[in-house]
Amino acid sequence: MPHPRHGLDAAFQTPLRLSLMAALGREEIDFGALREALETSDSQLSKAITALEHAGYVAVRKGHLGSRPRTWVAATLRGRKALERHLAALAEISRGYLDS
């Protein structure tokens, strides 16, 4: 049986990307709300979103709210499944530590 670390997804190896996916859940969230919730800069959040978008894990929608441009981000089904696998691998790795 392979070690559970092989189930970790490289797309989630930065704390911000992992936090971003967890924050999204099944909702579409405004960029500004994500920035505030994750306590990060526009630049760092934009980079994290771009990386996850390239992996197919998030979808980005741009539009306007009134006359103001807005960006919304949502986890894709592929992204939610990848996060579930990643978290399961982390839990399995942690179980080994907690059981000792």
Language model regions located:
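Surface-exposed beta-strand edges and their flanking turn/coil or helix-capping segments
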Residues: 33-35, 46, 72-73, 86-90, ...
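Basic, amphipathic "hinge/linker" alpha-helix immediately C-terminal to the N-terminal HTH DNA-binding motif
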Residues: 65-86
